[in-house]
Amino acid sequence: MEEMNKAYATFEERDRIASLGGGVDKIEKQHESGKMTARERIDMLLDKGTFVELDKLMVHRCTNYGMDKNKIPGDGIVSGYGKVDGRQVFVYAYDFTVYGGSLSASNAKKIVKVQQLALKNGAPIIALNDSGGARIQEGIESLSGYADIFYQNTMASGVIPQISAILGPCAGGACYSPALTDFIFMVKEKSHMFVTGPDVVKTVIHEEVSKEELGGAMTHSSKSGVTHFMCNSEEELLMSIRELLSFLPQNNMDEARKQPCADETNREDASLDTIVPADPNVPYDMKDIIERVVDNSYFFEVMPNFAKNIIIGFARMAGRSVGIVANQPAYLAGVLDIDASDKASRFIRFCDCFNI
């Protein structure tokens, strides 16, 4: 009995250490930088009390550079499943307080496991990224972990919704997986994603560039088109993910949940007769028409800052989730250029995959 008590005490201590990630000091630094911890993010994202964590006590296997003497349970990834509005989702979050959220061979297995479970159960998967990239102490083994993650991203594409949030300085491999998912969220002035950071750019091509210019939320929201949603805070971002999920089905064999609607489907709006000018050379805002047609005049726009000459997003009609694609006469006369075509076609493919 005494031995069992000792074993249980050891387990409880490891569980406590895992819950603290990199420790109290690192958590304080995370908060000082204006960021939440991985566990705080998951708690805010999911319905209260629904999170079930997997592989909480896993540690890395690296013995190089004294790493064998510095093992933290959880190894920088918090993963598991829970519910959003009563619907099952799978989630994993990089813990920046543990080795800068770097990817190891071991914690890559945690991510792959959750990806496989999401695919098997036909449920959306959400990635909360706050990672410096590969763990250099592990060399090629860490990079191999990325290959496994990317493979699962491609296998899940068009089968289950994949959503990524960039919540810190994500470089290298930490950017590639999000780019393979369906939707990316970023936070103004807090989120950055780039293949290599400003220091490497300066060393290689002798060009000075800030983190914001190279890979900030505005850059990817308006220029590269990599990110779909730019938010003002982490709290807003996490709530926006919950809202996006409300428009989506669980998988490609399902349909989006129909919402109760008090908006009369047969209502008429006289303003629709006057929004479009008689002169075809006079611009108007297509969003005015969209908002008058959809339920409760609410339109959840996707990629609002990129290729503004075309509008895409989700809304509801008679309580059913619909995808909307519309030319925007108020910007470049609503012409179809390369960026607008890419923006619209990708959205149409997504809606087609998920019965929207």
Model-derived regions, located:
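Terminal-region recognition feature
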Residues: M1-I163, P169-Y176, L180-V200, I205-I356
